[in-house]
């Protein structure tokens, strides 16, 4: 996963309060 996607994932996790493994785009 690209660095940008990682940053987006982190933001989504912080805003939605979901687990990171549910947001992975692999």
From Swiss-Prot:
Principal subcellular localisation of the protein: cytoplasm
Carrier domain: residues covered: 2-26
The keyword Lipid metabolism belongs to this UniProt entry's keyword annotation: yes
Record's subcellular location: Cytoplasm
Keywords carried by this UniProt record: Cytoplasm, Fatty acid biosynthesis, Fatty acid metabolism, Lipid biosynthesis, Lipid metabolism, Phosphopantetheine
Entry's Gene Ontology cellular component terms: cytoplasm
Pathway, per record: Lipid metabolism; fatty acid biosynthesis
PROSITE patterns: CARRIER
Domain of life per record: Bacteria
Gene Ontology process terms (BP): fatty acid biosynthetic process
Post-translational modification: 4'-phosphopantetheine is transferred from CoA to a specific serine of apo-ACP by AcpS. This modification is essential for activity because fatty acids are bound in thioester linkage to the sulfhydryl of the prosthetic group.
InterPro entries: PP-bd_ACP
Family affiliation: Belongs to the acyl carrier protein (ACP) family.
Function field: Carrier of the growing fatty acid chain in fatty acid biosynthesis.
Protein name per UniProt: Acyl carrier protein
């Amino acid at each position: 996963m690209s660095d940008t996607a990682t940053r987006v994932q982190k933001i989504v996790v912080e805003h939605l309060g979901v687990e990171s493994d549910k947001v992975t785009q692999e």
